[in-house]
From Swiss-Prot:
Family the UniProt entry places it in: Belongs to the ATPase delta chain family.
Protein name: ATP synthase subunit delta
UniProt signal peptide: none
Complexes and interactors: F-type ATPases have 2 components, F(1) - the catalytic core - and F(0) - the membrane proton channel. F(1) has five subunits: alpha(3), beta(3), gamma(1), delta(1), epsilon(1). F(0) has three main subunits: a(1), b(2) and c(10-14). The alpha and beta chains form an alternating ring which encloses part of the gamma chain. F(1) is attached to F(0) by a central stalk formed by the gamma and epsilon chains, while a peripheral stalk is formed by the delta and b chains.
């Protein structure tokens, strides 16, 4: 697990560095989209993933391939960033860097993502109302990501970063049971 935490920290550092470069180029959105495309390609193309992971292929060779594939399609500094990742043997962190980049970019724009668990599918109006209430409660623009879990019985469970707001019927019934001194039936 420590390697995962260390990988996240390293990914965040690279994401911060790329965001600084992207802001200097006045294109944080565009660079984020490019990074996401590269990350998706790595995640979805087994051959590309194997190529980048292979210790038998020199970093210089990988950089040349990146340059030929992306050279005229991406900003020079973006390509240099990817080549530096390859040189530092961090190319397999690109998907994690993309996620961290998006999180940092959104946070700077006052946008947070919330995991919203509901007992049943929500309609568009209900989803909009939940997003508006969360935005009002957090003072930020909330982008909800819905998941259905019938075991919560009703209500919602919201996770924004490390904060969990449990308004589920299951929790409320559990609290009532404890207050009444009852045990679980």
């Amino acid at each position: 697990m420590a390697a995962g935490v260390q990988g996240e920290s390293v990914a965040r550092n690279y994401a911060e560095a790329l965001l600084v470069l992207a802001r200097k180029a006045d294109d944080a959105e565009g660079w984020g989209a490019l990074l996401r495309q590269v990350a998706d390609a790595i995640n979805n193309d087994v051959n590309l993933s194997r190529f980048l992971e292979s210790p038998r292929i020199a970093a210089e060779q990988k950089s040349v391939v990146l340059s030929k594939a992306l050279g005229d399609k991406v900003p020079h500094l973006f390509l240099r960033f990817l080549q530096q990742l390859v040189k530092n043997r961090r190319q397999m962190l690109i998907p994690a860097i993309a996620t961290e980049y998006e999180t940092l970019r959104d946070a700077a724009s006052g946008i947070v993502h919330a995991r919203v668990t509901v007992a049943r599918e929500t309609g568009d109006e209900e989803a909009k109302m939940i997003a508006e209430r969360l935005s009002k409660a957090t003072g930020k623009t909330v982008v909800p990501h819905f998941a259905v879990d019938p075991s919560i019985l009703g209500g919602v469970v919201v996770r924004v970063g490390d904060t969990v707001m449990d308004g589920s019927l299951r929790r409320k019934l559990g609290m009532l049971r404890r207050r009444m001194g009852g045990t679980r039936a």
